[in-house]
């Protein structure tokens, strides 16, 4: 919103910047990995990649016509990234994975990120793990032995309260308090545990909308079990 641009990314590994007044991209960056998820607030633009890698851009450098990641590093989660969502203040991001985990990563100074060169590129060193960074499990059925683990399909931050929601392949939506590292609310209003595929808040932060449908987490055969339907509108206080 600050820059009046459109960002796109795809499995070809290309991230494009479009000025809506022109037909083609004005800037482009080619990753070696597929792009799975992207999120941008203010100057912070974060890209979730295949092979569990994360790319961080500083969009303030666009004024100097520089469009390349400040950092490419290995995610602190062990399995495929499903969703990236930048904090409303642009000072960090949440990352969800197919393993039913969410990681919270704070960016203390976007203009002074640690640069540690390795054979595989640039990575964040251990000393960059701040005290406010953490990860937690979610979207799991612990009544089973072993527990059933579901993907985190989407993450959305409330623009007013700073809390955030997750939705998953288990058909559950949860609301979390990042500062106190606790779950505030959890509910499943969807019949037959149809996966929830995406979610978002309105600008006032009092409505949470989510979409539902099969997310292919159980392969093609399981798609026959799910039927499309309408979700009720939900009010979040």
Could you say what each language-model-derived stretch is?
Residues 1-237:
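WD40-repeat beta-propeller superdomains and closely related acidic/aromatic-rich repeat-like regions
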